[in-house]
């Protein structure tokens, strides 16, 4: 059991990103009985390494002071601890116990478990911190059904729909799963499940009980759990639920836990403080920036009290980290490590006084590094999945791409957990080892996230065009939700509504023919309506209101997580009405058709906002009418492929569409569809189009508010042709654009200038899907 602070401390602090939190803000924790006092009753091989090296006179080993290492929290600034450890190892300074908070707990816990400073540096440098700080699974790893929603609503504004239609918002900017996977990868094999207090070095991680504000010492929990709980920075990572408590960053009550190290028996302390000063935060315009400043105010107060407890024999190391933000995990590691090393070397004369002889150091390091596997650690076992309240073990195993009962190793189980997490329904998916009556098992334990249950996604669309013959503005609000699973086979019900210049109402039921079945049936109803400008020779001649209601019934086969193939029947009713006063006498036209369809869709793009990897392929064939003059068909094909070239990235896109009667399914005109021409102003029986888009990153939006800011350009080529018209390359229109793009929470936003080779120009403000 974790030991809580037994003394309630006065004061209540409001924590913006985590809700109201009563905090311990003065005083200290009740002292635990020194671990050295109870060491005499424990077998030597079970005692922490520091205690085994302090047997006292007459036991064959020299007496030396017991050294405690105290590592503060500080986010990316905490990587400075690695530089300090590098110097301690170089000077042969033995550390008998480690107490850490937040990133200090991560670095200190991994060191106590056997990692070297060099291995910790590789972790800081090579970890995909963008994935760790992401608010959801990577798009490329997710299921095709989830990626399909992005094409209609590329927004990241989502809420979970709970009982009584309540809305649940995410509790933090980043998710949990990737962080926990990174921590397990950091720890030596077999140490993630070892109790934090049973390492060869004495170790404690510090967390805060979010409900009570009490300090929580993590000692009996598995090491990976202790590190994860201590690193739960409010607003950045979700609180960690454990034994009925919600645990967050220990820095809120003890960012420099000097008193805990004393209570564990330390006689000399090496304290490394990397906390952010209260006047350092540069971004107070974002919710996360405000939350970070609130945390800084709280941690700075308790840190100063803790530093006041140091004595003349203790060493305080405070690296110069001016200008380094706590959230710069992806870019600040090398700078922080170097700063920590410089600060430690500045005190090398005092550190050398604590050094031990080379032979004693070799023995000390061997015992620290070569630790036995934690009890219950298994390299292989039977794979099981713990069912949730909404999904069976069979359905979850299918989503994880595995089979219940098969024998797997730990890496295979972790890969299955990653695939299950990528379904988008869970906060995290743990891999637990258990000894069952019929043998060892590796169990996938999905932890449901209320903010991902029945997700409601909200979107905003804006397209303004200035400079063409007919300026235009289009605005839309969208909402879509998916209810899943509807049954034991994993059925889904999806709904979409769009209000604005274009109105859409859609409902779809998608039903696999068994748990994990690749074969499915689908039925949908959709109604679209919008005002369309009709152009002739580049000039608007009239405006029509076009509405279409379509019902589909089909079946298909999933292509793994990449796409699907469908075929079936659809029945459509279209209505066209004039909107201009001069055309009202012509009256509306209605048409009802029944036709067969077949479609192929493949989507492995890494991003909808600005694709740089992966491919999108879409092909559709429709044929209707009974025979002769009534028969008609339409086809379209689209291909997009992302690429990178040094710092530049972008995509190449091509499309073609044709109708045996009437207009081709796709019209041209507008931003990135022959930029500089009016929106949807070019149509014919056949349309051809291609473009290349490239951009270079300039900056990055504040964490939690979006992604990269880029400058870029496009080169475009295309045309629409009537029957009998020439379709040579010289007949295609040439266009291009220069733009600044921002990956916002609502999707890709562009400010652009477009032009054609014929001299027409337009400026665009664009937000939403550009397909």
Segments (PLM) and residue ranges:
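Acidic/histidine-enriched alpha-helical segments
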Residues: 279-281, 352-369, 572, 614-617, ...
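Patatin-like phospholipase
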Residues: 30-101, 109-418, 422-429, 434-435, ...
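Buried hydrophobic packing residues in well-ordered domains
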Residues: 74, 104, 120, 213, ...
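Bacterial N-terminal signal peptides that target proteins for export
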Residues: 1-16
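Bacterial N-terminal signal peptides
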Residues: 13-25
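C-terminal outer-membrane beta-barrel translocator/porin domains of Gram-negative envelope proteins
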Residues: 442-443, 452, 456-467, 582-589, ...
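Gram-negative/organellar outer-membrane beta-barrel architecture
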Residues: 411, 416, 428-599, 605, ...
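Envelope-exposed proteins and targeting segments
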Residues: 65-67, 199-203, 265-268, 313-315, ...
